[in-house]
Amino acid sequence: MEELVGLREGSSGKPVTLQELWGPCPRIRRGIRGGLEWLKERLFRAREDWYFLVALGVLMALISYAMNFAIGRVVRAHKWLYREVGDGHLLRYLSWTVYPVALLSFSSGFSQSITPFSGGSGLPELKTMLSGVVLENYLDIKNFGAKVVGLSCTLATGSTIFLGKVGPFVHLSVMISAYLGRVRAKAVGDTESKAKEVEMLSAAAAVGVATVFAAPFSGVLFSIEVMSSHFSVWNYWRGFFAATCGAFMFRLLAVFNSEQETITSIYKTRFRVDVPFDLPEIFFFVALGFICGILSCVYLFCQRNFLRFIKTNRYTSKLLATSKPSYAALVALVLASVTYPPGVGRFMASRLSMAEHLHSLFDNNSWALMTRNASPPWPSEPDPQNLWFEWYHPRFTIFGTLAFFLIMKFWMLILATTIPMPAGYFMPIFIIGAAIGRLLGEALSVAFPEGIVAGGEVYPIMPGGYALAGAAAFSGAVTHTISTALLAFELTGQIVHALPVLMAVLAANVISQNLQPSFYDGTIMAKKLPYLPWIRGRQIGSYPVTVEHFMNSNLTTLAKDMPLEEVVKVVTSTDVSQYPLVETRESQTLVGIVERTHLVQALQTQPASWAPGQERFLQDILAGGCPTQPVTLQLSPETSLYQAHRLFELLTLQALFVTSRGRAVGSVSWVELKKAISTLINPPAPK
């Protein structure tokens, strides 16, 4: 039944519903409706993004803090259970191992049962998406719940499994950003452009890092280095604005919950400010960077090959295919047994949480000098004021526990990365790097117990400064980033070691970037995700190689003067998504692009006015309304491989046509470009 309308007395003549005419308080309701329409118009402007970025930052800060709060309660319950079971070794062992085994198996089973995209870090897939590849259903909101629950269970295992939350939280932030983008597009009644979506996803990646560490500057820079090969400076403010909102809200919640008196850094340090290091120590910081670079190459090589072994081994591949929770439980049992405190875990500070690991490693006092004439007892519980007691053993010494910690955590982390569950891998790498730096710093403090003498002044060595540099250098070398130096400063709240830390990070990257792909690039290769290899500079001869050497010359074109019978044969015999449109079959002059879906739809709905038996051509279909796209960008056969690679990366392209004097002569897609780069980097052996 149609709604009745009428005219209000004294109105301009615009009809309104009778319900509005006779309803209570019509003027107030009209005012409220007008205000809401004005608010909608203001909020959903095409170029207004501040409200979107604020909502994204605040939401991710709330989620991050809520997860930390819940995880902290679960970890505290685990410690209470381990403490209250008594002195029986069997009960203590079961209380220590069953907890992480149950949590990890549930994390793997729950997340994988909902969606397989919820496992792992998520950063390799996001990096692939931002390069232009479409991964279906990867940003669906249903993945969000699976990722949150699975990640919470993973982190609730504590330092036993030794995993973090950076990568999965970036994935969560990007999913929220994609969902908010769809909501905004629906409210406006328009579809969001691909470029706009990429801009918002880049800002969301920065928010994910910032709300984990409360570090907006390094969050933006780290997300740019990891996720993008090219970045628009115009989009800079989005990342910084959203990351600042998220980091501020994250630390503000800690103040509201009486965890902090004011907004401060997460891992506060007490490094000497007047003279934090002497000039000769620069050499040791650079040497530490080279050591971290070499060790990062060893780690990346072992991790990538072990992951390949797990996937190809007959037994492990079958277990992963049939019962992922069983594999997760088996690995968790191994890791928990190794870290059992009365056993081997006594020599690797296994009772400390990951945050306590960093707090203790950043201590500016020399443990080796403090234990030279004293032997502190091993407390029944970790002492918050003396966490370094957990690193000391009278027979093993500080150097033994640090070295043993590095050796054990090295292979344990590699094993943990094979578990199909939501988990981050940056924080464990950061802690391992801090242990490397701490070991070198303790060795230097013993070698120079009175400090380094230069010009008559004595400056004692602070091992905590080397731990800070090692954390930034090793994590930067593994991820191929420089922003980890800034992250170390934002985490500790001190910048007194800015120059030596940055030099260590650069030295580590010199080694790792020339010998191994980054952790995320290696994962992309292991998962066989579509990606373009990186051409490192111009010195490898990418300019002499031109497009005509690797383009696909078997190009199927559609000419305007082609009969419809031949068009149908071409469409049914090929499965390409788009066809190059040429002027005539003889000239082969490229004039546009026809999408396969539009062409099939036009062929199926031929006009009824066409006389039967009359020969029709493709131009008749085009004149009837079949849409075509202009060719805005094309390659020349003389275009170099380096230039083609830069175009594909910069514009996130999937394929381009090759023309010579206007004639369509071939095409280049990711497949041809990747094969050409791989052949250039690893040329085949001469026959």
Curated annotation (Swiss-Prot):
Major subcellular location class: membrane
Database matches in Gene3D superfamilies: CBS-domain (3.10.580.10), Clc chloride channel (1.10.3080.10)
Cytoplasmic side: 507-687
Protein localization: Basolateral cell membrane
The keyword Transmembrane helix is annotated on this UniProt entry: yes
GO biological process per UniProt: regulation of body fluid levels; renal inner medulla development; transepithelial chloride transport
Pfam families: CBS, Voltage_CLC
Catalysed reactions, semicolon-separated: chloride(in) = chloride(out); bromide(in) = bromide(out); nitrate(in) = nitrate(out); iodide(out) = iodide(in)
InterPro entries documented for this protein: CBS_dom (IPR000644), CBS_dom_sf (IPR046342), Cl-channel_core (IPR014743), Cl_channel-K (IPR002250), Cl_channel_volt-gated (IPR050970), ClC (IPR001807)
Gene Ontology molecular function, alphabetical: chloride channel activity; metal ion binding; voltage-gated chloride channel activity
Ranges of residues in domain CBS: 551-609, 626-687
GO cellular component: basolateral plasma membrane; chloride channel complex
Keywords carried by this UniProt record: Calcium, CBS domain, Cell membrane, Chloride, Chloride channel, Ion channel, Ion transport, Membrane, Metal-binding, Repeat, Transmembrane, Transmembrane helix, Transport
Residues engaged in binding Ca(2+): 259, 261, 278, 281
Tissue: Specifically expressed in the kidney, predominantly in the inner medulla. All nephron segments expressing BSND also express CLCNK proteins.
Transmembrane segments: 52-72, 94-114, 161-181, 204-224, 236-256, 282-302, 325-345, 396-416, 417-437, 458-478, 486-506
Membrane topology classification: Multi-pass membrane protein
Effect of inactivating the gene: Mice are born at the expected Mendelian ratios. They develop nephrogenic diabetes insipidus associated with polyuria and water diuresis.
Function: Anion-selective channel permeable to small monovalent anions with ion selectivity for chloride > bromide > nitrate > iodide. Forms a homodimeric channel where each subunit has its own ion conduction pathway. May conduct double-barreled currents controlled by two types of gates, two fast gates that control each subunit independently and a slow common gate that opens and shuts off both subunits simultaneously. Assembles with the regulatory subunit BSND/Barttin for sorting at the basolateral plasma membrane domain and functional switch to the ion conducting state.
Family: Belongs to the chloride channel (TC 2.A.49) family. CLCNKA subfamily.
Subunit structure of this chain's protein: Homodimer. Interacts with BSND.
Protein name in the entry: Chloride channel protein ClC-Ka
Gene: Clcnka
